[in-house]
C-alpha cells in the first residue's frame, strides 16, 4: 500500500494560486500527498510533507518556507528532514501525541489556528486522531486521513471517500459549517470542482454506502492502516 524505499519521480497535483501539492511516490496505492500553502502573511507552510529528489522546486515560487506542519498522528513522514532543511520547527496541533514521538526535530504546539486555517480535531478511533484545517478566506479545506479520493477508498461515484471505520458515525460536526471551494487531501488528488457538493454527498450518504464499502474498500483500507503503523 505504501512504498518505503527512496522516492523517485514525484507528481505535482492540486496547484492553485496559494498552494500546490505533490505525490512523492505516485505509483503507490495509498497515494500519500503533501502540500505547500501560502499563509496570509506570505510565508509558506509545508503540510504533512514527503520528500523526493528536487521536490523543493515544486513550491519554490510560492515564497520562503516558514514552517512545517504535521496534522495527523500517522503523518510524521519526512517532516523532520524538511524542518532541518528550512531551519524551522515542526508544528503539531495539541491532541496529536503519537506523532511527536516519531519526529526527530524541535516541535512547536498550536491549538486553534495555523497559517490562517482554523483547526478541528477528528478522532474516529481512540488510536486515531487527526486535525482538519479550514481557511475561510479562500475556502480551502485540508483533510489528512479520514477523507481520500483514490479509487481504493471511494464507493461508486463518490469523489471523496470516507474511511470505512468512520462511515457508521460520520464526523459531520467537524464539517458542519464548512463550504469549501477546494478539498486538499493527505491521500489522493484534491477535489476542486463542486467541492462542497462532493463533501456533502460523502457525509450525507456515508451510512447508506457502508455495506458496499465493507466489500469494496474495507480490505484495502485495512491494509493501509496496518502499513501505516509499521
Predicted features, each with a name:
Residues 2-10, 14, 21-22, 27, 81-84, 88-129, 136-138, 163, ...:
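Metallo-beta-lactamase
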Residues 27-29, 50-53, 72-75, 125-127, ...:
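Short beta->alpha connector loops
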Residues 63, 115, 178:
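Structured loop/turn residues at beta-strand edges in well-structured enzyme cores
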Residues 31, 53-54, 73-78, 97-100, ...:
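Active-site environment of divalent metal-dependent phosphoester hydrolases
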Residues 23-67:
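Pre-active-site segment of Zn-dependent metallo-hydrolases
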Residues 46-49, 66-73, 91-94, 142-145, ...:
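Active-site neighborhood of phospho(di)ester-bond hydrolases with catalytic His/Asp-centered motifs
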Residues 50-93:
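Active-site metal-binding motif and surrounding structural segment of the metallo-beta-lactamase
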Amino acid at each position: 500500500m505504501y512504498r518505503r524505499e527512496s522516492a523517485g519521480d514525484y507528481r505535482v497535483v492540486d496547484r492553485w494560486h496559494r498552494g500546490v501539492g505533490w505525490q512523492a511516490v505516485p505509483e503507490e496505492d495509498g497515494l500519500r500527498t503533501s502540500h505547500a500553502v501560502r499563509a496570509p502573511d506570505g510565508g509558506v507552510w509545508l503540510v504533512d510533507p514527503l520528500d523526493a529528489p528536487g521536490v523543493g522546486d515544486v513550491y519554490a515560487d510560492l515564497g520562503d518556507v516558514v514552517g512545517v506542519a504535521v496534522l495527523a498522528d500517522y503523518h510524521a513522514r519526512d517532516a523532520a528532514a524538511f524542518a532541518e532543511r528550512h531551519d524551522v520547527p515542526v508544528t503539531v496541533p495539541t491532541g496529536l501525541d503519537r506523532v511527536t514521538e516519531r519526529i526527530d526535530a524541535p516541535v512547536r504546539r498550536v491549538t486553534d489556528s495555523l497559517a490562517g486555517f482554523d483547526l478541528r480535531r477528528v478522532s474516529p478511533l481512540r488510536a486515531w486522531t487527526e486535525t482538519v484545517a479550514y481557511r475561510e478566506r479562500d475556502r480551502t479545506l485540508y483533510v489528512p486521513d479520514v477523507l481520500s479520493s483514490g479509487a481504493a477508498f471511494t464507493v461508486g461515484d463518490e469523489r471523496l471517500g470516507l474511511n470505512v471505520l468512520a462511515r457508521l458515525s460520520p464526523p459531520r460536526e467537524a464539517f458542519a459549517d464548512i463550504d469549501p471551494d477546494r478539498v486538499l487531501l493527505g491521500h489522493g488528488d484534491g477535489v476542486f470542482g463542486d467541492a462542497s457538493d462532493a463533501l456533502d454527498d460523502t457525509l450525507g450518504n456515508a451510512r447508506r454506502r457502508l455495506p458496499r464499502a465493507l466489500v469494496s474498500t474495507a480490505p484495502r483500507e485495512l491494509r493501509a492502516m496496518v502499513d501505516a503503523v509499521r
